[in-house]
Structure formats: structure tokens, C-alpha cells
Amino acid sequence: MFLDPVINFFGTVLEMFRSGGVITYLIAAIGIYGFITALEKIHYLRKISRVSTPQIIGAVNESMEKGGALEALREIGQYQNPVSKIISEALKIGYRNRSEVEDAMERVFIVEMSNMTRGLGTLRTIIEVAPMLGLIGTVIGIWYTFRALGVNADPAAMAEGIYVALITTILGLAVAIILMPLYSYITGRIDDEIDKIELIKKMTNWGYAVMRISVEGNVDDVVKALMESDGVVSVRVVDEPDANVVVAFKPSMLEKSINNIIIERCGKSAEIIESKLRQ
């Protein structure tokens, strides 16, 4: 029957495990766990890289031209990957000074790095430990062989010892040989994602921002304080239902956020009505 070769193969494998002893089962168990871990990690990395970085950047730039940061946030909310999360964080607080934006992006980066590298240490350990377990099985098999070479030499016992030594060695090496290319592939994909993130962190240094704010009372001192601040390009008073000051500035050049400047220099608080970031 056509099933005979398959049945014979599995029968041979079971016989190998029975003959190899506990070490064989242990190597097989960690090998299966490592293989499953590798497949899960590959699936995760393929999922987060499904959308290209240029596609995300294009969507952000187009959205910012239409409706500013809020529109861009809505647009990239559909992309759940490290690049989109870094950009989202920069958009959320992009009107603040550069150090605050960088700190926020760094926090997201740390979280995403943890997600990407989770399980890698275990996988690497399995690759290193499996051959060592095989070596232990080899030593045990040799011990069986020498014990059989006693006063009454037993050829069957000698053969069993050699068999144990060979099986455990082969299985340990096989686990390492199978998992090592998967590990290399995973680390390569992670490095690619890190390169993308580093590029995005540099690209999110927005050229300038326009903010509409509402300040209670006289705004002359607010206008003066803002104009004297580094990074502020222009300030103008407007008569709008929800805002009375519009300020344009370069986020990367601000020492403090716009709101903090107003609080510290004027003793007033400002309500941010709208902020738009521009490349």
C-alpha cells in the first residue's frame, strides 16, 4: 500500500526516540518549541511590514495638507506597525519642542523593540543548547558502550550505546541547523524595521507648525512673549469665535512648548484650539 512507507518512517522515528532515551525527548521538545516560536515571530514581522514606509509617509503628507495633524492621525490609525506608531506619537505632540518629541518617540521605540525581539533570546538559547544536549547523549552512549565492554562483552549492549550516542548527536545538530537560518532571517527582518524607524525619527522633524490658540484677557503681552522666543516665526491676533492668536513656529527650535512659554512669561494659560504640522 502507498501508506506503508509513511507508516515505516514514523515507526523508525518512534524507535529512534525509544532507543535514544530521555535526552532525545528533551531535544525534540525544545526543538518543536523553538520552531513554533520562530514561525510566530516570522508571521508577526511579515504582518508589521505589510505596508511600506513610503506608503505611510505619502498618506501622512497628503492628510496634513488637507486637515493637519488630526487628519493625518486618522489616516495612519489603520496601520498598526512600529513606523505608524512612531509617526502618530510625533503628530500628537509635534507642536512641542524637539526634546519632548524625541523623548515620546523613544518611548514608543522601546515598546516596539520589545515586541519585535520578544522570544529571540529563547530561540538563540535553544540553538546553543540543543547540540550540547546531543553531546550529553553522546557521552551517555559511550558510557553504555564501555560498560558493555566488561568482563563478559555484550555486543548488543555495545550496539545500543553507540546507537544512543549517534541518535542524540544527530538530533541535537538537526535542531540547531534548522533553527539557525530562521533565527538569522528573523534578526535580519528586525534590523530592517529598526532602520525604517530610525529614518522615520529623523523625518518627523517637522519644518514648521501653525497653531490657533485662545488666551483670556489682553493678548498683547502674549504676542510679545511669543515673538521674543526662539523658534517662533510669526504671531498675529485674530478675531475668531474659538481663537484669538495664531502662531507659526519651528518645533525643532523651541526650547519650551508654546503653552509653557505663555504660562511662564505672562502668567496665563492658553487653550490650544488647533495645531497643524508641515514638512
UniProtKB/Swiss-Prot annotation:
The chain crosses the membrane at residues 19-39, 126-146, 162-182. One of its GO terms (cellular component) is plasma membrane. InterPro entries: ExbB/TolQ_transport, MotA_ExbB_proton_chnl. The lineage of its organism: Archaea, Methanobacteriati, Methanobacteriota, Methanomada group, Methanobacteria. This is Putative biopolymer transport protein ExbB homolog. Belongs to the ExbB/TolQ family. It comes from the Archaea. Its main location: membrane.
